[in-house]
């Protein structure tokens, strides 16, 4: 898998002693990101055979839970999960959107 062709979503779980990360990679061609005032809408299109595992991955997030994503190896965006839209199934693909809110960098929050 060529990292530069994918968006990698990351979910942290476990505890401080045993932190774990669950990742999901989606081809860049199937991801479109739109910025709104205080959030981002991420439209996702995946082949129908990948839709179940992809949707299940995002359904595991709770409202406000941390989510990270890395676009083509450019570094992690730290966000809070805000929700998932209904899924639209077509013949060969499924599409849906997730909403995330970018987190404030720690040093900006203090000052």
Region locations from a protein language model:
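Short intrinsically disordered terminal tails
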Residues: 1, 110-111
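Solvent-exposed edge beta-strands and adjacent loop segments
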Residues: 1-41, 74-87
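Short beta-strand and beta-hairpin "edge-sheet" elements
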Residues: 18-19, 66-110
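Oligomerization/assembly interface segments of phage tail-like spikes and tubes
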Residues: 28, 32-52, 91-107
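Short coil-to-beta transition motif at edge beta-strands of beta-rich domains
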Residues: 58-68
């Amino acid at each position: 898998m060529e990292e530069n062709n994918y968006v990698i979503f990351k979910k942290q779980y476990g505890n401080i002693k045993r932190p774990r990360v669950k990742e999901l990679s989606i081809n860049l061609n199937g991801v479109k990101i739109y910025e709104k005032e205080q959030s981002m809408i991420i439209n996702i299109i995946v082949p129908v055979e990948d839709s179940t595992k992809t949707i299940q991955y995002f359904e595991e997030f709770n409202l406000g839970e941390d989510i990270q994503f890395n676009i083509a190896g450019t570094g992690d965006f730290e966000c809070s999960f805000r929700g998932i839209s209904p899924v639209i199934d077509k013949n060969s693909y499924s599409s849906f959107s997730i909403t995330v809110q970018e987190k404030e960098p720690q040093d900006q929050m203090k000052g």
